[in-house]
């Protein structure tokens, strides 16, 4: 870890900002993250990162948020910009994208509370319920976990309550657990899809939710991931496993996604802050290990960005993956120091991963009407899309992922 930490100091902390978008939002040496006269890094400027997060918020609101079918008291995210005719009427239903936009709306309220943001959260929740058929359930367990988490945060931080929805979703997630493959919940409804896949994207956010609900199933779910889907050599979290007809494990899918690292990190942090001293230490150790694995195996370097920038995973669903990881890296940076000095290097590293990625995303934005437009790979320049292209920059997921990243940076800047 010392090597990675030194590399972070050497290559990330002293990199100057090169892009300006709005007053006092960064020019040469203007982001508060450049080198000072003695080569040390200047403190991050909370006001600047808050302003950048607000610009990302405004851009998503202006380009994507609309009333659902012109219904009063609703809002929802149009899945593409420029939007196709089907997208304009919310034909494609991207349930879990909307859950993450809701989470970002909650982030924005926490950053700068006001009645309009609160009302927007309430309208958005109404839009999700109506578009989903006046119900909360979905075929995919990971989708339901994300909506439950977003609703829970909306209640905790904004005061918009949907307790019946959270209970319904949590109950559905419990029903997804079986002993096949050693435990865990399925990726999607087994009866409908003849499912044989259990993965971290479903079990990770479920463990986070159960931990916040103080449900002991959180421990079982996270332990299942640790026992079956963490590389013992690198600490990287794998994707999932296939369950054989006899209930054994037929195959482990060892593909690595930023998404999986983020949700397992989040689960470890929740359990570390919940359990007794011994349990807390164990889960904090796993969280620190995951941060180190991310820095070592899931970052990129390019001419357009310094190292320690989180790896992009394309558009569509992949547009959210790195943003999810950034959310929980920010939590790691703030939480791990509570468990002693041995966790300070991992907390430092988590901070650097968030800020390096946020600087790169900001630097590589594309000019667009009504605010910055971000690409799916923050280490590369974004491109302005047209309606007749499949450019990932069109996707709401990609823009929400970058917004999530900038909210994480704004949170760290005001709390560190």
Which role fits each region the language model picked out?
Residues 13-14, 39-99, 111-146, 154-158, ...:
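CBM-like carbohydrate-recognition segments
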């Amino acid at each position: 870890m010392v090597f990675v930490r030194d590399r972070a100091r050497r290559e990330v902390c002293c990199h100057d900002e090169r892009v300006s978008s709005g007053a006092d939002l960064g020019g040469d040496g203007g982001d508060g993250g450049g080198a000072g006269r003695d080569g040390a890094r200047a403190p991050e400027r909370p006001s600047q990162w808050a302003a950048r997060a607000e610009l990302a918020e405004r851009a998503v609101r202006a380009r994507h948020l609309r009333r659902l079918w012109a219904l009063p008291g609703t809002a929802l995210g149009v899945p593409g910009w420029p939007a196709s005719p089907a997208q304009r009427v919310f034909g494609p239903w991207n349930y879990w994208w909307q859950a993450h936009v809701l989470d970002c709306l909650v982030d924005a309220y926490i950053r700068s509370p006001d009645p309009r943001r609160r009302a927007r959260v309430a309208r958005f929740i109404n839009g999700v319920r109506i578009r989903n058929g006046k119900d909360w359930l979905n075929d995919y367990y990971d989708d339901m976990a994300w909506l439950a988490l977003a609703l829970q945060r909306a209640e905790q931080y904004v005061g918009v309550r949907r307790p019946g929805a959270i209970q319904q979703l949590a109950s559905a997630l419990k029903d997804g657990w079986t002993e096949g493959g050693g435990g865990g919940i399925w990726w999607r409804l087994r009866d409908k899809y003849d499912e044989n896949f259990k993965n971290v994207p479903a079990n990770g956010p479920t463990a986070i939710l159960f931990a916040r609900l103080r449900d002991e199933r959180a421990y079982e779910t996270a332990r299942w991931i640790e026992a079956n889907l963490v590389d013992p050599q690198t600490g990287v979290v794998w994707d999932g496993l296939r369950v054989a007809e006899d209930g054994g494990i037929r195959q482990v899918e060892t593909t690595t996604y930023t998404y999986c690292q983020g949700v397992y990190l989040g689960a470890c942090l929740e359990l570390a802050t919940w359990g007794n001293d011994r349990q807390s230490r164990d889960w904090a150790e796993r969280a620190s290990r995951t941060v180190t694995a991310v820095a070592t195996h899931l970052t990129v370097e390019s001419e357009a960005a310094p190292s320690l920038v989180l790896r992009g995973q394309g558009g569509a669903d992949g547009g959210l993956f790195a943003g999810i990881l950034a959310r929980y890296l920010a939590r790691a940076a703030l939480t791990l120091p509570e468990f002693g000095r041995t966790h300070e290097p991992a907390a430092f590293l988590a901070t650097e991963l968030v800020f390096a990625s946020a600087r790169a995303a900001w630097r590589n934005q594309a000019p667009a009407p009504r605010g910055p437009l971000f690409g799916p790979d923050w280490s590369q320049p974004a491109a302005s899309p047209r309606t007749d292209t499949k450019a990932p920059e069109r996707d709401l997921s990609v823009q929400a992922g970058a917004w999530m990243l900038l909210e994480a940076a704004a949170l760290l800047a005001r709390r560190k």
